[in-house]
């Protein structure tokens, strides 16, 4: 997984439990309001299908950053090996999260499976300021340079 240390199994056991540190936690840059600006990770074929669902704590966290009916959207999707903990979620409109975003993550999983791995880069826009993104840009790049990308509004 993306655990940056060699000697610990999880980064913070208060957020999630991952006994072997195998879930994907993206590298994230944040703005002055603690809003997510960018996220990146490398997903390998072996990561596919190893992610975890969100939990009550991560859903509460995401809704405090966004709307009361928002999903805790995975930055790196569950099907791509992403953790459901607080360090890998953002406030996402549930229609988008369960619809076009989930479908695109399935396309990314197929892309990773085809190419063996992919570098993921995600950029979040905040047209209204605050901590709930209004638009998400998602790009996956294979080792040979092939790319797939999409952009999503965070409303329906």
Give the label of every model feature segment.
Residues 1-23:
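Short turn/helix-capping motifs enriched in Asx and small/polar residues
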Residues 26-156:
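Domain-level detector of nuclease and nuclease-like folds
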């Amino acid at each position: 997984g993306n655990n940056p240390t060699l000697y610990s199994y999880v980064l913070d056991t208060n957020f999630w439990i991952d006994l072997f540190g195998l879930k994907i936690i993206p590298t994230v840059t944040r703005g002055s309001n603690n809003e997510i600006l960018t996220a990146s990770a490398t997903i390998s074929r072996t990561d596919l299908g190893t992610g975890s669902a969100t939990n009550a704590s991560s859903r509460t966290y995401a809704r405090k950053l966004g709307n009361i009916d928002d999903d805790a959207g995975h930055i790196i999707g569950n099907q791509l090996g992403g953790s459901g903990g607080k360090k890998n979620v953002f406030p996402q409109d549930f229609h988008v999260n369960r619809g076009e975003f989930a479908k695109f993550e399935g396309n990314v999983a197929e892309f990773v499976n085809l190419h063996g791995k992919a570098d993921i880069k995600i950029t979040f826009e905040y047209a209204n300021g605050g901590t709930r993104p209004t638009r998400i840009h998602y790009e996956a790049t294979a080792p040979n340079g092939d790319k797939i990308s999409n952009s999503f509004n965070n409303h329906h």
